[in-house]
Amino acid sequence: SYFSIKFSNLQFSTKLIDGKYPDYEKVFPSGDPSTLSIKKEKLQLALSRASVLSNEKYRGVRFALSKDSLKLTANNPEQELAEEVLEVDYKGSPLEIGFNIGYLLDVLGSVESTDVELVFYGEDSSCIIKEPSLESEVYVIMPMRL
């Protein structure tokens, strides 16, 4: 019940698990989506600036989305506040949702495209991040309460 691969100076081993593989598709939200389209670098830079003042333990950032506008807010226990408003292409109902800023930056660092889409299904549902030109890769980020 083990699987092993050996290369010249590398060995990879894993234990095979008996059981049913979890239904990963349940992680993907469904419903009426709201979509944010933005240049990856524009969002990365804004999140990097906000991360300076985010809470070191929870690293939260709040997204306040409305027609063609994204307001990013991060704060810390010292009552310092970072706030930035970005002009974006947003289609959907107004929405406020929080995320771990580190997770967002990690995903954006993995995306190769210059543009990204963030698809929201409500404040309590996960967010899908994808490259518009590459439908086969999607990233799922769970929201956090702020």
Question: Which stretches of residues belong to each language-model region?
Answer:
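DNA polymerase processivity clamps
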Residues: 1-17, 32-146
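Short hinge/gating elements
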Residues: 27-30
